[in-house]
UniProtKB/Swiss-Prot annotation:
Note: Present with 3610 molecules/cell in log phase SD medium.
EC number(s) on file: 2.5.1.157
Signal peptide stretch: none
Keyword field: Cytoplasm, Nucleus, Phosphoprotein, Ribosome biogenesis, rRNA processing, S-adenosyl-L-methionine, Transferase
This protein's name: 18S rRNA aminocarboxypropyltransferase
Positions carrying Phosphoserine: 286, 289
Catalytic activity, reaction form: an N(1)-methylpseudouridine in rRNA + S-adenosyl-L-methionine = N(1)-methyl-N(3)-[(3S)-3-amino-3-carboxypropyl]pseudouridine in rRNA + S-methyl-5'-thioadenosine + H(+); N(1)-methylpseudouridine(1191) in yeast 18S rRNA + S-adenosyl-L-methionine = N(1)-methyl-N(3)-[(3S)-3-amino-3-carboxypropyl]pseudouridine(1191) in yeast 18S rRNA + S-methyl-5'-thioadenosine + H(+)
GO cellular component terms attached to this protein's record: cytoplasm; nucleus; peroxisome
Function: Aminocarboxypropyltransferase that catalyzes the aminocarboxypropyl transfer on pseudouridine at position 1191 (Psi1191) in 18S rRNA. It constitutes the last step in biosynthesis of the hypermodified N1-methyl-N3-(3-amino-3-carboxypropyl) pseudouridine (m1acp3-Psi) conserved in eukaryotic 18S rRNA. Required for processing 35S pre-rRNA at site D.
Top-level enzyme category: transferase
Protein family: Belongs to the TDD superfamily. TSR3 family.
Matches recorded under Pfam families: Fer4_RLI, Ribo_biogen_C
Disulphide-bonded residues: none
Length: 313
């Protein structure tokens, strides 16, 4: 082989280099893949960032998916963020007054597991504008229906929705099959927060909403108790029970009467019922008639009596 014969050179005319078999070279394929990946990355109107602690499954992590799409940037521990930092370590809640900060500097989140918050070095991350999120319900596949258990994309979307940028919230959530369900699930509550101004007003709205939920829960419990009491004290059921008792007693009495009557009944050879008391009375009558006949005659001869009624033979 000659020296440098297998060395790959960049074509001068800009066309993809082909091998002896007419196919493009492997190096050209790699170059095209990198170009395709860069073209697929999206841009968001404001800066998005996260501190990723690899607590979640990469296939189900919403933050990692946003990173693959090129929508969010991963920060190192020790780096600070100038925009809104949605963090469990925040002091106040996100409010509509934060709109200017969001539009100028963006928003960031902490990508970690709710069960491993104690492992997160909050003193080494964050920024000047750390915020909590008010009461909202998760719609993601892991914590659906659970309050405050939002994942990364839900937290960012909630921040944008509260400050009034529903378009940004919808754009982020559109990359997830369940994403728009988050806005539908919290529609009424987000509209309430959007009508507030500062952090205190959002906090009051949150407390009023929680009191409303508590009241509805107590009402449901009281209604359930009343329904249980009504079922236990149903008059119709009691009446049916007494009627059944009386009917049973009547049946028992009738059965006892029949049994008593059966004791006085016998059957002849043809299966006809014969009452014993009637039979006995008939036998007694026949015996009396026989006695009378025997009294009127004895051995075919008439009987005579003295004046005192004694039989004279």
């Amino acid at each position: 082989m000659g020296k440098g014969k297998n060395k790959m050179h960049e074509p001068k005319n800009g066309r993809p280099q082909r091998g002896a078999n007419g196919h493009s070279s492997r190096q050209n394929h790699r170059r095209m893949e990198m170009k395709y990946d860069n073209s697929e990355k999206m841009k968001f109107p404001v800066k998005l960032a996260m501190w990723d602690f690899d607590h979640c499954d990469p296939k189900r992590c919403s933050g990692k998916k946003l990173e693959r799409l090129g929508l969010i940037k991963s920060l190192r521990v020790g780096q600070k963020f100038q925009g809104i930092v949605v963090s469990p370590n925040g002091k106040g809640v996100v409010c509509p007054d934060d709109l200017e900060i969001v539009e100028q500097h963006g928003a960031s989140v902490v990508e970690c597991s709710w069960a491993r918050l104690e492992e997160v070095p909050f003193n080494k991350i964050g920024g000047k504008h750390e915020r909590l999120l008010p009461y909202l319900v998760a719609a993601n596949q892991v914590n659906y229906g659970r309050p405050w258990r939002l994942n990364c994309v839900e937290a960012l979307a909630a921040c944008f929705a509260i400050v009034g940028r529903m378009d940004w919230a919808s754009e982020l959530l559109s990359h997830f099959s369940w994403g728009m369900g988050f806005l539908e699930l919290n529609k009424e509550l987000l509209e309430i927060y959007q009508q507030c101004t500062d952090c205190d007003s959002v906090k009051r709205a949150e407390e009023e909403w929680l009191q409303k939920l508590e009241k509805e829960t107590q009402e449901r419990k009281s209604r359930a108790k009343e329904e249980d009491i009504w079922m236990m004290g149903n008059i119709n059921r009691r009446g049916n029970g007494s009627q059944s008792d009386t009917s049973e007693s009547e049946e028992n009495s009738e059965q006892s009467d029949l049994e008593g009557n059966n004791q006085c009944i016998e059957y002849d050879s043809l299966g006809n019922a014969i009452r014993i008391d009637n039979m006995k009375s008939r036998e007694a009558q026949s015996e009396e008639s026989e006695d009378e006949e025997s009294g009127s005659k004895e051995n075919g001869e008439p009987l005579s009596y003295d004046p005192l009624g004694n039989l004279i033979r």
